[in-house]
Amino acid sequence: MKIASQNADRALLLVIDVQRDISPGGRLAIAEGDAVVPAINQLAGSFQHVVLTQDWHPANHTSFASQHPGKQPFDQIELGYGPQTLWPDHCVQNSPGAEFHPGLSPELLARTELILRKGFRPGIDSYSAFLENDKQTTTGLADYLRERGFQRIFIAGLAYDYCVRYSAVDAARAGFETWVIQDACRSVGPASSEDAATRAIEQIGVNRITTADLL
């Protein structure tokens, strides 16, 4: 029996930030970021329930290097809530770059029960689908999932070393059985960043699997 088919009504596919700006040709392009799209589309038939997250930044978002004179994308700074990586302007609200990747299948979108927009507060970033970067402000997703009886979360999307990593860690901390679908993710940073993400999710007990384990 495939993993996702066990208690299928309590299993959820969580797709992180598969958007135009985070795909090749976008403002925060991830190399081979669009390679996750076919894998995620394949998974649609294995899940009854899907949630998509969407980076949704105001134009003056504090995570943008353009808001900090003298700083460049990928510089590190300290903000009131802790360290922050600065990014190119990306996924600005209502811009074409904030749209979902056009290759996501109609079947996947038809099964989507919630689109969770994150990073919309100007003064704080939100890598995780569950908590803002201050680790205190909740997105409400954990309560939404608990109220509907979900227990098992399978995560795919972009970027593995940031938003997937922090979403997986926070899902596990919130008490959900959590899997990351490795071949349906890509990283934005170097190999060292990907390795750090893998260590972080494994240390908290998140499982790493592939699409073959689910199809």
Language model segments and positions:
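Histidine-anchored nucleotide/phosphate-binding helix
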Residues: 39-43, 164-175
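Short glycine-enriched, charge-decorated loop/helix-capping segments at active-site entrances
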Residues: 26-33, 129-133
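Extreme N-terminal starter segment of soluble prokaryotic enzymes
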Residues: 7-13
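Short acidic-hydrophobic, aromatic-tinged amphipathic segments that line or gate anion-handling sites
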Residues: 205-215
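Short, flexible loop segments at boundaries between secondary-structure elements
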Residues: 180-194
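Active-site alpha/beta core segments
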Residues: 38-148
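Active-site flanking residues adjacent to catalytic metal/cofactor-binding acidic residues
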Residues: 16, 54, 182
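Residues at the starts of beta-strands that form the adenosine-phosphate
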Residues: 10, 48-49, 112, 152, ...
